[in-house]
């Protein structure tokens, strides 16, 4: 479709009307360029897909929404805007689209959040109820849904009242009532525990109400994980050919795709035996009480028992072999170099893939049959079986995918990382097997790039080391296929608005010198706090361990520090805003996640402290396998993996400072390697152009470190 004169006029008119809605609107050349580039791509005038880096201040959200809505209307398609996190998704849904509705009154839009963000009305009713009959019913359905105390029951009753009177839409993030994680776990549900159309509350369920709204909406705000799942199952979203897709925070897409394709499952022998026994009993109950018209051969008891016995013996053999690779009787991990399994293990995985897929198919067949049963049956008993079969289906789906992936030598032209872990839980050792592909470009090509005609990939940061090459390698986007890559200029004058400070540290932030380095950092930070020059500050760390050691050095300043983990992030930010508004000093302290999506302007943030260059962890099975693979191709892992990742992280961290034309301040980076190592100049060259200062550092006094046993974490 060509961009007609009428379409161009419509986009221009909306853009002009928008300027009147936003106080102190500043017209920006990069924004006009982005609107034009997005329009040309979505209309099919230029290229296949567009990757466009739009630095902070460009106004990228409105720059893709205006042309996106205009072209979607012209072509009678649905515009899907996908983000990487709930916060940005909610901002677009609750702020940006309502703003556009003022100039496009008939605009229809909705948001599609993951199932786990919505309340389950069945669970809410049970937790809000004071009637024992409700609890008895749910106990029969195998659900543990009882309020812990009267206060919790009253809270749930208030939530139910808000839901019933349409004061609340059922989203966790859209209520002021405090809901802790334990309560929300019981209030929400997952695919395996949802009765779907068989549920009494189906028509009023917030999750399914939203899913129905998608069919009528012109704009759907989703997230990357949901989009990937929808493209895989061809559900939730309209047909790919009838979509215009914008992937905001597009730099997260390869990681989200990899996470979606990562498979892990418990394979502990007693646990597996129990699951198989439960499934055979479940099938027997279905055959006895809700016998299907056509009996699948595998449901015949003798055949099913033999099938499960073979599966059990294979799992037992797998346990025996894997345990040989790990020290006995303790937590351990073993990774297979280059993802290559010994022939004996490979044969077991291939057979497991076939056997678990057959059980998955059987569970799906019974579930479909149970879902079609009429009201002439015992509805409570039927619902209990549906829930149990749904959970069995979920288990066998994961197992089938896991063993299929384990059987592959490569995925997207790269090895599949494969490893086993032994973990202790409640005094018992459990064995797990994990698989994840290093590259996901083939999957993205199949699900997105080849399926949807035109896609916009955008973010404030898409490049690392001034290059799109890392994005291209990880995503599979390429100029040869007609994809375009555009980097817009920043509208800010960084040279005048701020500066980079690299203190003259005595120590590099290596593991050997970590304690001395953090002591120096704490001394310089204390000096900055005592200067009282800055109200709002942010301190970013590459690891939780380093953050905790830093806090040990500044215990006397703890009251002004708002530390990640103390409270939910949005509450920390709210408190930070209130403090600064009252003229108090406030310091946010966090990890890399605080370097993204944190929009604090002016005095709210005028000094950013960065602990060190954030290279990716080198102990992750995925990173190690990728390094082995790159070396086998005579490529240098530091250049391909570590440095681009570090550059990307540093750009995001530094980007917290200048968020508007009125912002000012300093970025303090406690890492002299930026000036002493050859790669340091390349990292600095990829940052906005700031003047650089190198002040002296007061001597840090090293504290004695208390010996503490660090908790074991699962590595990926």
UniProtKB/Swiss-Prot annotation:
Does the keyword field hold ATP-binding? yes
Q: Which InterPro entries match?
A: ATP-dep_Helicase_C (IPR006555), DEAD/DEAH_box_helicase_dom (IPR011545), DinG/Rad3-like (IPR045028), DinG_proteobact (IPR039000), Helic_SF1/SF2_ATP-bd_DinG/Rad3 (IPR014013), Helicase-like_DEXD_c2 (IPR006554), Helicase_ATP-bd (IPR014001), P-loop_NTPase (IPR027417)
Motif DEAH box location, chain numbering: 131-134, 248-251
Its needed co-factors are: [4Fe-4S] cluster
Q: Which parts of the sequence bind ATP?
A: 54-61
Tell me its EC number(s), please.
5.6.2.3
Q: Which Pfam families match?
A: DEAD (PF00270), DEAD_2 (PF06733), Helicase_C_2 (PF13307)
On cofactor binding, the record's note says:
Binds 1 [4Fe-4S] cluster.
Q: Which UniProt keywords apply?
A: 4Fe-4S, ATP-binding, DNA-binding, Helicase, Hydrolase, Iron, Iron-sulfur, Isomerase, Metal-binding, Nucleotide-binding
Tagged with keyword Nucleotide-binding:
yes
Q: Which GO terms describe its biological process?
A: DNA repair; SOS response
The Helicase ATP-binding domain, residue ranges: 17-294
Domain Helicase C-terminal: start-end pairs = 487-698
Q: Which reaction does it catalyse?
A: Couples ATP hydrolysis with the unwinding of duplex DNA at the replication fork by translocating in the 5'-3' direction. This creates two antiparallel DNA single strands (ssDNA). The leading ssDNA polymer is the template for DNA polymerase III holoenzyme which synthesizes a continuous strand; ATP + H2O = ADP + phosphate + H(+)
Q: Where does [4Fe-4S] cluster bind?
A: 120, 194, 199, 205
Q: Its biological function?
A: DNA-dependent ATPase and 5'-3' DNA helicase. Unwinds D-loops, R-loops, forked DNA and G-quadruplex DNA.
**Name of the protein in its database record:** ATP-dependent DNA helicase DinG
Give the source species: Shigella flexneri
């Amino acid at each position: 479709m060509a961009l007609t004169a009428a379409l161009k006029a419509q986009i221009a008119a909306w853009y002009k009307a928008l300027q009147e809605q936003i106080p102190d609107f500043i017209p920006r050349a990069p924004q006009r360029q982005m609107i034009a580039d997005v329009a040309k791509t979505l209309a099919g005038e230029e290229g296949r897909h567009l990757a466009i880096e739009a630095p902070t201040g460009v106004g990228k959200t409105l720059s893709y929404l205006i042309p996106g809505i205009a072209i979607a209307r012209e072509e009678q398609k649905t515009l899907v805007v996908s983000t990487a996190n709930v916060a940005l998704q909610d901002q677009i849904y609750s702020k940006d689209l309502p703003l556009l509705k003022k100039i496009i009154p008939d605009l229809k839009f909705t948001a599609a959040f993951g199932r786990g963000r919505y309340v389950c009305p069945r669970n809410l009713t049970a937790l809000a109820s004071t009637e024992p009959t409700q609890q008895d019913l749910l106990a029969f359905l195998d659900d543990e849904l009882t309020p812990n105390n009267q206060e919790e029951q009253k809270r749930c009753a208030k939530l139910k009242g808000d839901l019933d009177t349409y004061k609340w839409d059922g989203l966790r993030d859209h209520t002021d009532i405090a809901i802790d994680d334990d309560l929300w776990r019981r209030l929400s549900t997952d695919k395996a525990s949802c009765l779907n159309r068989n549920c009494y509350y189906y028509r009023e369920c917030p999750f399914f109400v939203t899913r129905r709204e998608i069919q009528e909406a012109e704009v759907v705000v989703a997230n990357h994980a949901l989009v990937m799942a929808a493209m895989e199952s061809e559900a939730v979203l309209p047909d790919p050919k009838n979509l215009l897709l914008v992937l905001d925070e597009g730099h997260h897409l390869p990681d989200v795709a990899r996470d979606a394709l990562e498979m892990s499952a418990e394979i502990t022998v007693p646990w597996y035996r129990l699951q198989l026994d439960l499934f055979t009993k479940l099938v027997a109950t279905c055959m006895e009480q809700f016998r299907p018209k056509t009996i699948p051969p595998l449901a015949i008891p003798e055949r099913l028992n033999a099938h499960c016995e073979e599966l059990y013996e294979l799992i037992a053999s797998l346990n025996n072999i894997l345990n040989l690779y790990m020290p006995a009787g303790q937590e351990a991990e073993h990774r297979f170099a280059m993802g290559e399994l010994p022939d004996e293990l490979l044969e077991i995985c291939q057979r497991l893939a076939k056997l678990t897929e057959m059980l998955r198919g059987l569970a799906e067949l019974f579930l479909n049959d149970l879902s079609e049963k009429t009201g002439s049956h015992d509805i409570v008993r039927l619902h209990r079986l549906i829930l149990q079969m749904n959970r069995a289906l979920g288990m066998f789906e994961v197992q089938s995918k896991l063993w299929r992936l384990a059987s592959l030598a490569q995925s997207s032209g790269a090895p599949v990382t494969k490893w086993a872990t032994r973990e202790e839980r409640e005094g018992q050792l459990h064995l797990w097997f994990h698989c994840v592909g290093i590259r996901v470009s083939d999957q993205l090509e199949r699900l997105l790039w080849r399926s949807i005609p035109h896609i916009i990939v955008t973010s404030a940061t898409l490049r690392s080391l001034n290059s799109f090459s890392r994005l291209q390698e990880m995503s599979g986007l390429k100029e040869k296929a007609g994809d375009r890559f555009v980097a817009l200029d920043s509208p800010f004058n960084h040279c005048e608005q701020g500066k980079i400070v690299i203190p003259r540290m005595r120590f590099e932030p290596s593991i050997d010198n970590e304690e001395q380095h953090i002591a120096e950092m704490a001394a310089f930070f204390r000096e900055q706090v005592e200067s009282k020059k800055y109200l709002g500050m942010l301190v970013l760390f590459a690891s939780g361990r380093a953050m905790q050691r830093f806090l040990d050095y500044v215990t006397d300043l703890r009251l002004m520090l708002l530390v990640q983990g103390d409270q939910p992030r949005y509450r920390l930010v709210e408190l930070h805003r209130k403090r600064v508004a009252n003229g108090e000093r406030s310091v946010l302290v966090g990890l890399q996640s605080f370097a993204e999506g944190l929009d604090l302007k002016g005095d709210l943030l005028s000094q950013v402290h960065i602990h060190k260059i954030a290279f990716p962890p080198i102990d992750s099975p995925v990173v190690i396998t990728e390094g082995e693979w790159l070396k086998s191709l005579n490529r240098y892992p530091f250049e391909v993996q570590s440095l681009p990742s570090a550059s990307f992280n540093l750009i995001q961290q530094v980007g917290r400072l200048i968020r508007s034309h009125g912002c000012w301040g300093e970025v303090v980076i406690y890492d002299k390697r930026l000036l002493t190592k050859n790669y340091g100049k390349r990292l600095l060259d990829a940052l906005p152009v700031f003047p650089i200062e190198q002040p002296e550092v007061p001597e840090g006094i090293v504290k004695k470190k208390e010996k503490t046993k660090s908790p074991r974490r699962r590595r990926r």
